[in-house]
């Protein structure tokens, strides 16, 4: 990358990074499937020379500098559990739980350095609710929540979101109409702040994160979905 400087406004600048090194990623995981439905996983991933654009307040002048720099380490390890469950014929749900330890280190972050670690928890619940069969109405409802996190010198506030979609199948299931809203309460993009060794910065990127979509599809003629070979599950004791 070139060392050019571009200006966002009278205070913010974007600096290029000559000599930026490619990152190297390593990862591993161990998974256990219980009763062919419950999934438990241990995971680890580490990126050496990880690069990411972050903000830094210059110490010699009034300027906010955005620059992509190589970090020494970006590491995550933790556990993940996926628990599906069903209530009658009207509710099909999946609960995903994740707990991880994040470590980020950079010894040459402008005139600073950082070596930070944090425990992070993530919960996600996906639900499919059968409202009625005649008419064929289905509600998809998903909720997500994440505890405070870090990103370089940033402290990331907790984040949560709710997504909802209503699907109507009609004309002998050849036609489908879906109305969907993502991030219903505009809470999915967290507030970020820097309070680190004299750096003081607030960043709110969450405005207008709610989205609405309408999707219509129609299957003509006698089209049938292509059948695929079933997966061999004998290794699960089936």
Give a label for each model feature:
Residues 15, 21, 27, 39-96, ...:
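Outer membrane beta-barrel strand-and-loop segments of large Gram-negative receptors
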Residues 26, 32, 38-46, 95-101, ...:
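Transmembrane beta-barrel strands of outer-membrane/channel proteins
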Residues 1-6, 10-14, 45, 50-59, ...:
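Outer-membrane beta-barrel translocator domains and adjoining extracellular loop/strand segments
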Residues 24, 34-36, 46, 85-91, ...:
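Outer-membrane beta-barrel strand-turn architecture
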Residues 21-37, 42-44, 76-77, 84-86, ...:
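Outer-membrane beta-barrel transmembrane strands
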Residues 1-48, 135-142, 155, 159:
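Structural signature of Gram-negative outer-membrane beta-barrels, strongest in the C-terminal barrel
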Residues 117-238:
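Conserved C-terminal beta-signal and adjacent last beta-strands/turns
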Residues 34-38, 77, 89-95, 135-139, ...:
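Outer-envelope beta-barrel architecture signal
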């Amino acid at each position: 990358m070139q060392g050019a400087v571009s200006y966002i406004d009278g205070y913010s600048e974007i600096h290029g990074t000559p000599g930026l090194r490619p990152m190297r990623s390593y990862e591993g995981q161990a998974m256990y499937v219980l009763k062919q439905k419950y999934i438990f996983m241990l995971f680890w991933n580490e990126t050496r020379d990880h690069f990411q654009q972050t903000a830094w307040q210059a110490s010699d002048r009034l300027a906010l500098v955005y620059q992509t720099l190589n970090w020494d380490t970006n590491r995550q390890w933790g556990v993940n559990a996926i628990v599906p469950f069903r209530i009658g014929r009207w509710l099909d749900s999946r609960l995903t739980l994740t707990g991880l330890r994040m470590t980020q280190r950079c010894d040459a972050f402008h005139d600073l350095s950082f070596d930070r670690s944090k425990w992070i928890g993530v919960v996600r619940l996906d639900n499919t609710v059968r409202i009625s069969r005649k008419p064929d109405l289905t509600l998809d409802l998903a909720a997500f929540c994440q505890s405070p996190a870090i990103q370089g010198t940033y402290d990331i506030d907790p984040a949560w979101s709710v997504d909802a979609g209503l699907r109507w199948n009609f004309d002998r299931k050849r036609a489908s109409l879906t109305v969907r809203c993502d991030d219903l309460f505009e809470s999915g993009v967290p507030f970020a702040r820097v309070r680190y060794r004299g750096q003081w910065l607030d960043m709110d990127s969450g405005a207008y994160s709610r989205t609405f979509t309408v999707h219509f599809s129609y299957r003509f003629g006698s089209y049938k979905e292509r059948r695929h070979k079933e997966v061999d599950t004998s290794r699960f004791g089936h």
